[in-house]
């Protein structure tokens, strides 16, 4: 029996992710980069679907495997998980195809187990309604099994958010996110790019969250000339909303403290270039107008290279990349920046559907994260000039990492006030969980709780 190449690719990705504890998004990007033969959407659906529902699928399989899931060899278990996911969640795949293709995979990658896999999957199909039910007494245990999340994290989330919000968050984590792109409005209008993409067969819709984001369906966007020309970038609506919120248009110097992989850096740089271009078009002089500059800090060299590559593709010459630890102060930048973005490392609890491995993490050291976040914000605040702004953002719904950080910072910094706060979350407005707060450094105030004084 010939093996379906898409399912083979999905199997190999799942095996590598499980064995080596890799991030699914990175492994899939590596696997699917530039290969036109593969059905990328189908592979992503199976890989993400299996990872998102792993505990639930294993709970089902335990009903049909006498020795239990935990004693089943990994190769067989991954094939069974793929089969159950296709049968239970993928209406486009007939049950017989899910079984037959799983058997074909077993003959190649789990030799001698094809009969066992065939029997388990057929037995599941015969008993699908009863087997799919989660029959446990505790509410938290139910959430952990049905939405495939370690019980310890479920307990943490319920303590943070309450039961109903935790349930909504975990349900949201099982939904597919729309593919969105940020238009490089320094080069082309949103309408202009939408027209070009529609002419190539793509379906485009305007984002409700950002006026320079399009929701796109219809094919391999990164292989279009428009992508290669730097007319757009793949970026979530929520991430672009942070750059919109920061609003770097009029800034002369912006410092992005945790810049890699560079999406928000580039989004701000595009804002600045577009504003500069508009200013030049209104100026009668022949001399060009400076667009301002972004200093992008990143602690790791290989991730700094990602920012530089993004800048080159988009044609952005107003970004300077520095390999630097954001918790350490750069003396020559103190008091120089119009805008500082502190998009800090966080628990990622707001983006579980994009990083489903978060649900299975052994533990979260929230105290350590909070200390890092405080240190980055503290260091970043020193770069802000009087009258300048400091934007703090995360992709988590944990109040300790969000409002808690801001409250702590403001209690020690009378020279800053909170101008604006935005919360995105599945249980408030249906988006992934992001937090943003814009702080302004007020002229005539001094730090360390000294109150308002003349300077």
Predicted regions and their residues:
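S-adenosylmethionine
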Residues: 1-455
């Amino acid at each position: 029996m010939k093996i379906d190449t898409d399912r083979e690719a999905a199997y190999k990705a799942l095996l590598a992710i499980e064995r080596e504890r890799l991030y699914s998004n990175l492994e899939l990007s590596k696997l699917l980069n530039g290969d036109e033969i593969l059905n990328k959407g189908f592979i992503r659906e199976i890989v993400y679907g299996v990872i998102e529902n792993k505990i639930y699928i294993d709970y089902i399989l335990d009903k049909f495997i006498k020795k239990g899931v935990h004693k089943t060899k990994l190769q067989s278990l991954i094939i069974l998980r793929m089969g159950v996911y296709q049968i239970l969640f993928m209406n486009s795949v007939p049950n017989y195809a899910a079984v037959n293709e799983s058997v074909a995979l077993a003959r190649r990658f789990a030799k001698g187990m094809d009969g066992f896999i065939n029997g388990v999957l057929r037995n599941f199909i015969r008993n699908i309604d009863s087997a799919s039910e989660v029959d446990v007494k505790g509410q938290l245990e139910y959430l952990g099994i049905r939405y495939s999340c370690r019980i310890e994290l479920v307990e943490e989330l319920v303590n943070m958010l309450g039961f109903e919000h935790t349930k909504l968050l975990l349900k949201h984590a099982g939904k597919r996110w729309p593919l969105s792109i940020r238009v490089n409005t320094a080069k082309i209008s949103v309408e202009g790019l939408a027209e070009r993409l529609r002419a190539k067969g793509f379906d485009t819709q305007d984002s409700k969250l950002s006026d320079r984001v399009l929701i796109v369906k219809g094919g391999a966007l990164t292989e279009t000339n428009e992508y290669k020309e730097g007319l757009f970038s793949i970026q979530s609506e929520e991430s672009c909303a942070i750059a919109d919120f920061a609003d770097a248009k009029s800034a002369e110097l912006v410092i992005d403290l945790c810049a890699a992989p560079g999406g928000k850096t580039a989004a701000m740089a595009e804002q600045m270039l577009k504003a500069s271009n508009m200013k030049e078009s209104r100026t009668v002089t022949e001399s060009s107008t400076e667009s301002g500059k972004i200093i992008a800090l990143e602690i790791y060299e290989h991730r700094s290279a990602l920012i530089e590559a993004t800048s080159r593709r988009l044609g952005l010459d107003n970004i300077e990349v520095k390999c630097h630890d954001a918790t350490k102060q750069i003396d020559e930048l103190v008091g120089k920046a119009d805008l500082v973005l502190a998009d800090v490392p966080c628990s990622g609890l707001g983006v579980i559907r994009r990083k489903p491995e978060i649900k299975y993490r052994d533990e979260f050291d929230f105290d350590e994260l909070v200390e890092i976040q405080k240190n980055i914000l503290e260091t970043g605040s020193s770069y802000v000039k009087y009258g300048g702004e400091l934007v703090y953002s995360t992709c988590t719904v944990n109040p300790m990492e969000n409002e808690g950080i801001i409250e702590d910072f403001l209690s020690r910094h009378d020279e800053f006030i909170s101008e604006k706060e935005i919360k995105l979350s599945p249980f408030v407005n249906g988006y992934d969980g992001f937090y943003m707060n814009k702080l302004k450094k007020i002229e005539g105030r001094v730090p360390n709780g000294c109150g308002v004084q003349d300077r």
